[in-house]
Amino acid sequence: MVAKYNLETYFSGVWQDQNFKCLEYSGYQLVDYVNAQNPSSVLDVGCGYNRFKGKIKNLVGIDPYNDAADIKVSVEDYTSAPFEIALCLGSINFGDVDYQLEKLHTLWRKEAIFRVNPGIPHKWADYGDIEWYPWTPDKIKRVAKQYGYDIKCLEKEYTVQGDLRYFFIFAK
């Protein structure tokens, strides 16, 4: 289990979203994609600095560590009626990922859009003992099968530092 202190320290002082504008699939390119669906509600899980606020219609950002969130809460503790679309861009990478996925299943109705880390530690030295969940294409496919999701896309994406991430969209 990841110590809350380590996550809070990491996200409040170490992590920066310097990649956001440069990501091929999961940066600002998502604005047009999501808005074209005219969603009645969008949940941004682990929204960080809430960069999509005001850009994506009907968006609510949750994050347990960042004051820019609309609601300062973790996905594990968040309760709400389901949103049409969920964004999970780097937030489902540590802790009890299986429980987080189970909880997320109740929070979206149409699509969930993910960017995940395949278990590659970040290059910053100050993130304590945070272990990154080892996402793989096979794991993504198993999760889809477990919950009965379709996979609309599954792509490799690279950060500005050259680190691999996976971008995928689940559909119900």
Cite the ranges covered by each PLM segment.
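A short, conserved alpha-helix within the catalytic core of class I
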Residues: 94-104
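Conserved S-adenosyl-L-methionine
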Residues: 149-159
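Hydrophobic adenine-recognition pocket in adenosine-nucleotide-binding enzymes
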Residues: 91
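Conserved beta-strand signature within the Rossmann-like core of class I S-adenosyl-L-methionine
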Residues: 109-121
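Conserved N-terminal segment of class I S-adenosyl-L-methionine
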Residues: 1-43, 48-76
